[in-house]
Amino acid sequence: MKDLTERQRKVLLFIEEFIEKNGYPPSVREIARRFRITPRGALLHLIALEKKGYIERKNGKPRALRVSKSIRNKIPLIGEIRAGEKREAVEYLEDYIEIPESFLSSGYDHFLLKVKGESMIEEHICDGDLVLVRRQDWAQNGDIVVAMVDGEVTLKKFYQRGDTVELRPANREMSSMFFKAEKVKILGKVVGVFRKL
């Protein structure tokens, strides 16, 4: 999965969803229209996906393609997050990991982060775990969130009172962090935890 660019991944997902909804694959023009690119650009993406083994095409026939390797439930692992102090936000694609569909919220993007640190151990989120994050820009009190403050990200429980946000660890040995609400950007809500035994 590392061999797909982000745009190729999105094109492949679009093809899969289009087939599921309509019963047949999209045309090159429909792909181009969806991504606001030229038909030639769409064709180049299809050629790349075919070379990488994700689709099969029959040359010269419209809509003659099929998906040979699905990525529907493959979620991007985009790096690490500290469950402790804040850390500079660096997003880089490490891999794609297949996640059961029942873990995914319909209509939302998801991503995975590898946890570093012990600030969330009382919520059973440990060093080395993978957290499944539903991408959203809001949170309710008590949600476990990925939050960004001054360009740095952290994994904490979210509480807001008035214009003050508390990012609270789930470890009694650590202290909460308090910020003005406008300084805190929610990147997503944790909806699952995966651990190797």
Curated annotation (Swiss-Prot):
One of its GO terms (biological process) is negative regulation of DNA-templated transcription. It catalyses: Hydrolysis of Ala-|-Gly bond in repressor LexA. It is an enzyme of class 3 (hydrolase). Keywords: Autocatalytic cleavage, DNA damage, DNA repair, DNA replication, DNA-binding, Hydrolase, Repressor, SOS response, Transcription, Transcription regulation. Residues 28-47 bind DNA. The record marks 83-84 as: Cleavage. SUPFAM superfamilies: LexA/Signal peptidase, Winged helix' DNA-binding domain. Its EC number is 3.4.21.88. Coiled coil: none annotated. GO terms for molecular function: DNA binding; serine-type endopeptidase activity. The active site is at residues 119, 156. Pfam families: LexA_DNA_bind, Peptidase_S24. Represses a number of genes involved in the response to DNA damage (SOS response), including recA and lexA. In the presence of single-stranded DNA, RecA interacts with LexA causing an autocatalytic cleavage which disrupts the DNA-binding part of LexA, leading to derepression of the SOS regulon and eventually DNA repair. Homodimer. Belongs to the peptidase S24 family. This is LexA repressor.
